[in-house]
């Protein structure tokens, strides 16, 4: 039979171990919350004095806001993550009579758009060149260069389910500085590289629109209302910030729920942007 002090020691050790687990969980939870708060701090949209917003693409999921008056002159478009539908690329190609390069290495479906010029590439954008399983990836810089578009005026739309972080982290600042507008959906809230990419983008662009995808509403992302969000980045070379407008800028009424039937979840702002 064990001595009482031995049993007592076991109890103390067990309680200490349990306390260490709880303390570790609390610290981890606090660190994760701090990361999400830092991400939200980087997602502060501004109003541009010289931007007329217009929605391009679908009425709901698949629609993106851009500064219509800052698009031309335009040489070509790049659409990453297309699947069977690319209303954004369709509208850009038809409206501005330019080709749109379509990239997707996972979904074999190819969108059709009468009157548009689509150039399909069975590859994805990533942080390096090469195959991952049977899927070929290349960098944003290489893809633009291979198509002869280096130094040309291009629009970029990106919805690649989390692959944006590595892809943009690998993109040189010089390349990002040459892109007038970048419309995209971003995914995630718990990876430190998200913060690194957002800070990199904020060096080169103004964040002009922020809309959360209501397919992804979750309290786990708080203070973010969802884990996926559409954004518009406008190059600082062409965008002029309105110093009299509030920051963060109120959300434009041109935004629409990705799902018209699910409850929406947006950050609260005082009034619609003009």
Residue ranges and their predicted role:
Residues 1-2:
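N-terminal secretory signal peptides that target proteins for export/translocation
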Residues 5-15, 19-274:
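Phosphate/nucleotide-binding beta-alpha loop and adjacent structural elements of enzyme active sites
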